Structures are given as C-alpha cells and as structure tokens.
C-alpha cells in the first residue's frame, strides 16, 4: 500500500512503538497525546524476547543494552520457607533459544528511548495537550476532534489505554471490572540490600491469596517490587490509594524474613496501592479505517508480564498489515484476525496465573508439581512469536 497518513491517539509504549514501525515502512504519523508534556511514569517493565525483537527492529537495541538489565533466571519461592518451587534459566539461555534478550528496565527509560527516537524522525509528529473528544470516519478520511482543534488522516489507531475514548466511540461505554486484586508497587535502592540475598533474577514468592515479585532495574540501582493481594471490594473513588511501607509490612507480616527485609529497605516518600481492573473481551476491535491497539482492546493483568509486550507486538503487526494490504479496512481486519486469538490467550492465561500464584493447600502440591512443565510450555508459546 502507498504511504499513508496515520493518526495515533495515545503516546504510551504501544502508540510510540507503532509510530516508529509505521515510519520505517514509509508512512507519515501524527500522535495525539492528552498530557501537556511527555510523562515517564511507572516503575519497572519486563520486555521478553517476543517484544525485544520489535524494539531491535526499530533501532532501540543500543539503548536497551545500555539501560536495561538481563536477568539470569526466573525463580519461584515458597512464601514462608523461601524454598525454591521452580527455577528457569533466562539470560543467555533465552537469547540463544528465542533469538533475542529478556530485558528488565525502568518504564521511564523505555519511554525515553522511544521518545528520543521519535524526536529524530521527520515522518512523526507528536502533539501534546491534544485531548481527543470525538472522531468521525468518512469514505476517504478520518477526522479527530480535540479540545484544541481537528486532525485528519487516512487511518485512526486508538492506543489510549484501558480508558480509551476511541474504543468508547466504536463500541459505546463499557465500565471496567474490578478483578478482586490490588497491588502495591514501589522501588528499593539496591545499595541498601544484601547482594547475597538478592541475585539478578526475577523472583516471585507465592503465598495463599497473595504474591510478591521483585527484579532489578535502573542499571542495577533499583529493585522493582510488585506485591499483589486479594480484596473483596475496592471502595475508593480513585483506582489508586496512598499508603505507607508499614501497610505493606502488615500485609506480609508472616512472610520470609529476607522478603520483609526487602520491604523494610524501601526508601520512598510515597507508596500507592493500585486496584487491578480489566474489561470483558471485545466483540471487535475496529470498523472501517479505525482500530485499537494494546490495553485499549485487550487490557491484561500483570501475571504473565506481557502487557507491554502485547502492545509492542500489536504495533509491529498492524504496521505490517497496513504496508502489505490492498485497502485500509481489509488491512485492519487482517490485523485483528492475526492478533485477537493471541491476545485473548494472554488475557486468559494471566487471569489463570493469578489463581495459580495464590493457591492454598491442598492445591499447592499439585501446582508445584506441574509448574515446571506448564512454565516451559507457556514460555515457548509466548517467546517464540515473531511479530515482524
């Protein structure tokens, strides 16, 4: 297909990756972002080989290898005893097997790499402060209205997250569902930790009704911590509730001493508990010249560490479909057909992992027995994928 003018709503990981993929295929892109400036929020993010391949293809490998950490292995531990339930090599083993590294890095570092690459790309414009309120698709063009003006393109991609205004325009308003789980997220300076107790691995501690994951980010300067607990309801008006480290210690009061030492080493003025929400699977992702990408169409729980990876895969596949297709609606339909079964699998597998991580006796013995087999099977299905 000849060079297109594509509008992308949302300057997150998925939207910016898609812009770079499109530019490298010769298309012109305008990214509309509601925030008045680039914001590099969030703590750690895991980039598995299936996503790394895409980021390498758009020229980010030098920055990734400089800013990111490659975990040596993945370890699952018993919440109270610290005994190893399962161990899987990552590092060089994953790179050799799947053709690309497994990276841990700060979300802000990944966003900086994407933003810097876009700043050097003459085919991409990013408009900050462009809060989209509506869109209209015609036969030959799509018109997007923001509070500050109107934009026109041939294709519209909603990469605007779980609260997507583009999804709402396509399918009507759908309220997100509280999953019955909440997460503490915070960073701990590694300088305050005993290096012997915390190796460069991604470690998940499994306990009844809750789990704790930690891994190194920020070129080894920080330990990213994510602690998930079950909750019967979320009564707060906001999705985010402020708290203190003492609250986290209370939630994990009977856990292994080394894990509690990790929590106690946190040196943060603010800590927040996040409610985990998802949405029902969508009947379709688009119509005509309009489609969705990432959390806008398949919001995913964090229990497979594949949320960012799915958006990155979407970005590459959608760019390829638009470049190879004969017409825009057909290209977008092909993209949806290629992606929907995989993202649905990841959504459902992530939900299942929440149950697995939080299993209670007597089911824990069965979980621990089948985890090595099931883990290898899942790893192959996820990391073997090639979106390019």
Model-derived segments and their meaning:
Residues 2-6, 23, 48-189, 232-251, ...:
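Conserved N-terminal helical subregion
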Residues 5, 28, 222-225:
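Residues at the starts of beta-strands that form the adenosine-phosphate
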Residues 9-24, 28-35, 157-158, 184, ...:
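Conserved mid-domain beta->alpha element of the FAD-binding
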Residues 38-39, 165-166, 299-301:
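Catalytic P-loop NTPase motifs of RecA-like helicase/translocase cores
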Residues 137-138, 215-217:
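Short beta-strand micro-motifs enriched in acidic
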Residues 182-216, 237-238:
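Flavin-dependent oxidoreductases
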Residues 196-197, 208-210, 218-222, 227-304, ...:
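FAD/FMN-dependent oxidoreductases across multiple families
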Residues 372-388:
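C-terminal auxiliary extensions adjacent to catalytic cores
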